[in-house]
Structures are given as structure tokens and as C-alpha cells.
A protein has these predicted regions:
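Phosphate/dinucleotide-binding and metal-coordinating scaffold of catalytic cores
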Residues: 1-216
Length: 216
């Protein structure tokens, strides 16, 4: 399903909607009127709630390639090289044509897993809080995606591992494969770090480099 409109959430508050104008090939953002009356001002330099312009649609940037036709203050939530590789693998696995993909589809895929405070609804379903991660399988699959890129083909038994990799690895920035995880130092149990509230767990970024795990 191709996303044409997304709720933009900040700390459980809907700050506005991001929509895609298919005819013009550009996105536009509209503040939630109820949010404009509050005290939060998430984008004070470029789209302040105090500005009269915030009462009108804010168009995406069609000139700067980096922003991918999104308003600059939302484009920063797009994944970097590694997250894009995972997304591309997911797209191929689900039979979605590349020409059907808009920036909104990518943000919808990120959902609640972004590195910043913004969340994009609808979200891509991830692994549940109770599920543990198999680091050996994650590492092997991450290396294959990184090395084979668009030529990678998932085996039937790798589908669940791919879901886990999506849940932990799509928002971490940079070129190299990474994952955001939560680890219990006593039991050595590892879970997704994209879900808050794991008691007794430390959160860190895991970097896959030549099948060696680096912890930060």
C-alpha cells in the first residue's frame, strides 16, 4: 500500500499531516490547528508555529536533491545509506516497483523507529517487545545485504530475520550496517533498541564490520 498521507507525531501529539501531491510530484506539510495553539515549537528556525506561514501548507523542496521533495525539517528523518539498503531489500521482497515509491512511503516504513523524536503514522510493524534477537542470523543477513546490495535474494527461512533487521537497523545513519539494540549486561539477552522501557537493559548502537561486532 502506497502512503499518500502521514500523521506526524511528537511525544504522542499529532503536530500535523504530510501529504503527497501526485500531480505536482512534491510533498506538503500542514500543521494540526490544535497543535498551533500549544507551547511546543519543533521547527522554530524554518517553520515556526508563531509564523503566519504556518497556517498554510508548507511545500517540499523540489530543488535540493538531498531533501527528496520533502520539507527540509522532515527530510532529516530519512534513512542514510544502510537504512536505504534495508528498505530496498524490503521493497523487492514485497514486489513494490521503484517508480511507485515516494518519500512518504519511506517515512511510513520508518514509522516509530526514527533516530529523532518524530514518528510517522502509519508505521511499519516491527518485532514485539518480548522477542529476543539472534545476533548471528542478523549479522549474516546484514553482511549479505551490504555486499550484494540490490542483487540480494532472501531465502524463505530468512523472512523473520529480515523483519528483525528492519526493526533494529533502518534508522541508524551512515554507510556501514548498524543496528540499535538493548542488551541486558547480566543475562546477555539482546532485544530491539527501538522500543523504550526495557528495564535492566543498556541501549547501544551495534556496527557490523566484516562480520565483527563493534559496540558503541
Amino acid at each position: 500500500m502506497i502512503a499518500s498521507s502521514l500523521k506526524i507525531m511528537l511525544w504522542d501529539k499529532e503536530i500535523g499531516r504530510l501529504s503527497w501531491d501526485a500531480r505536482r510530484g512534491v510533498s506538503f506539510f500542514e500543521y494540526n490547528p490544535a497543535f498551533l495553539g500549544g507551547r511546543l515549537d519543533p521547527f522554530p528556525l524554518v517553520a515556526s508555529v508563531k509564523s503566519p506561514a504556518s497556517r498554510r501548507p508548507i511545500m517540499g523542496d523540489r530543488e535540493t536533491k538531498l531533501y527528496r521533495k520533502l520539507p527540509p525539517f522532515l527530510a532529516d528523518s530519512l534513512p542514510d545509506a544502510w537504512g536505504n539498503q534495508v528498505f530496498e531489500c524490503w521493497r523487492i521482497q514485497n514486489g513494490i516497483r521503484n517508480q511507485e515509491i515516494t518519500p512518504l512511503e519511506i517515512l511510513s516504513f520508518i514509522g516509530k523507529r526514527g533516530m529523532g523524536a518524530l514518528e510517522f503514522i502509519p508505521e511499519s510493524s516491527g518485532i514485539r517487545k518480548s522477542e529476543k534477537l539472534n545476533m548471528k542470523l542478523l549479522t549474516d543477513l546484514a553482511q549479505r545485504i551490504f555486499l550484494e546490495r540490490e542483487n540480494v535474494r532472501l531465502l524463505p527461512d530468512e523472512s523473520l530475520t529480515m523483519q528483525s533487521l528492519i526493526a533494529v537497523g533502518t534508522s541508524a545513519g551512515g554507510r556501514q550496517p548498524k543496528a540499535i539494540i538493548a542488551i541486558n549486561p547480566e543475562t546477555r539477552e539482546i532485544r530491539s533498541g527501538q522500543i523504550a522501557g526495557h528495564k535492566g537493559f543498556d541501549y547501544c548502537i551495534l556496527k557490523f564490520v566484516d562480520c565483527v561486532l563493534h559496540w558503541y
